[in-house]
Amino acid sequence: MKNIMLGLMLSIFTIPAFAGSINGNVGYDSDYVWRGVTQSRGLPSVHFQGEILSDLGFYVGTYMAQVEFAGDDDTSKEVDFYAGYDLQVSDNVSLDTGYIRYTYDGVVESFEELYSQLNVGGFSTIVYHDIDTNDNYAEVSYEFGWLVGNVFDLKLIHGLNDLEGSDDFTQLQVGKSFGAENRYNFSVTVGQDVFEGQTADSVFASLTYNFDRGF
């Protein structure tokens, strides 16, 4: 599955008339929280994301971040690879499907997921399926653009996880873009965070710089 999809994506990018863009971001997080669970033991983390997107809707990308897990002194880096297709149905509706592989240094095992995301206006629903364990994760979010206008970004997120030992969670995220072409973004997220097996309320912040270049 992985080799077939990556081969298809790479073949798309070798088309002579191919046009698209390179985009991504680099950022600093006061806590790296993923699906309601800290991946850095509540400590700061630096991340990078880069993506090549074709005008046809196909894309490939990578995500890298610092991680730290309780009882594991060997794992410090996460590097993910993903590929997919984003179908723009209309100005307000899109369907994104793809594959992602999560890899770590140290002793943490890599794993793979398939995902599908539906965006309708401010609503977004995404479902991930673990290829090896058949576990599923779903996330529903809504952006309150009509309420806050261009003053700042306001987003409500609810995650549902059927992985044993994992809880559902809810987060409220407030963000603001600034600087030249609004390339910088600062956000604060309030919600639940699982740390060493205990769930508690948490607040964490992120500062990112976004970039893009067409070709």
What is the meaning of each model-derived region?
Residues 16-215:
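Outer-membrane beta-barrel proteins
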Residues 1-4:
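Positively charged n-region of N-terminal signal peptides that target proteins for export
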Residues 7-16:
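Bacterial N-terminal signal peptides
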